[in-house]
Amino acid sequence: MSVALIVSLTVSGALAAWMLIQTLSGGSGASVPRAGEQIDASFAGLRDTSGAALDERALATRYRLVTFGFTACPSVCPLTLMGVHQALEQLGPDAARILPVFVSVDPERDTPRSLSAYVNAFDARIVALTGSPQAVERVARQYRIFFDKRTLDANSGSYAVEHSAFVLLVDPQQRICVAIPSTDPPAQIAARIVRAIRASGAALNGNTAT
């Protein structure tokens, strides 16, 4: 997927998808991620595109910047990852203290190879994770994310995955710093990520928050 094609995706399409997701998740019983909430921010049972599990001990001092989606997502996911990329660029050296993660909610179709190509089209620093449907569902619930597989054609087996769309910034103490709707424009997503990091106590490089 070329960057030019990604940029051509419309915000209106993302908004329509988000409105559908909100309608579905509103009746699902899934909670919405909230700033200040303590969660289990582990990725137990998931693997990166090389087949390795994340070293949870290495995450003890890092912020997690987490999004959920899938490679066939038509509009919301590309716009979200553009925002993540812009935030990492704006943070400069501080970005080294952040682990940007993209968790696939379509483990049946998202292969390690396709996931790797997908996230690298936005930023090579983004770590793509996948696992069994059960493991993905468990981690999604920990992060207060809803997703649902909807059959489009029973004969062909085609389906779509509808999911709640947030960019979640989680601090090293596993508290949600901010939950940003993915329908925000990429530049606004980036600005809110940077602002949240610099407001969560001291800035990553030890400077006072601004």
Residue locations for each model-derived region?
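N-terminal targeting signals for export/organelle localization
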Residues: 1-43, 209-210
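Short loop/turn microsegments at loop-to-beta-strand junctions
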Residues: 41-42, 64, 164-165
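A short beta-strand-turn-helix
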Residues: 44-64, 88
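Short active-site neighborhood of thiol/selenol oxidoreductases, capturing the structured segment around
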Residues: 57-84
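Hydrophobic beta-strand anchors of alpha/beta hydrolase catalytic cores
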Residues: 65-66, 100, 167
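Structural microenvironment flanking redox-active thiols in thiol-disulfide oxidoreductases
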Residues: 79-139
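Thiol/disulfide oxidoreductase modules built on the thioredoxin-like
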Residues: 135-192
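Short, low-complexity, Pro/Ser/Thr/Gly-rich segments in the mature regions of secreted, periplasmic
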Residues: 195-210
